[in-house]
Amino acid sequence: MSEPTGDVRTLVEHIAKLLVDAPDEVLVYQVEENGETIIELEVAPADMGKAIGKHGRTVRALRSLVNAAGFRLNKRFELEILE
């Protein structure tokens, strides 16, 4: 059985690849820091706007999904987009 935090990373990666024009350039890292798991999303510079969305709606929705998954797992997650 896979580690639950890895499932959250995989979820973010899958959704991000569906949103952007260059899915092969999507990278997702997972960092444990101060008792929380930070999911770092990196996309091609040309796809940054698609990852963030109009007025930040897309990234806000992704963060909501990550937080909901963390709530179910009793774990704290944070999503960051790397430039």
Please place each PLM-identified region on the residue numbering:
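Short glycine-rich loop/turn motifs that provide flexible caps or phosphate-binding loops at active sites
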Residues: 48, 52-55
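RNA-contacting regions in translation and RNA-metabolism proteins
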Residues: 1-48, 65-83
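An amphipathic, aromatic/His-enriched active-site/gating alpha helix that lines ligand/cofactor pockets
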Residues: 58-59
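Residue-level signature of catalytic and energy-coupling elements of molecular machines
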Residues: 26, 53, 62
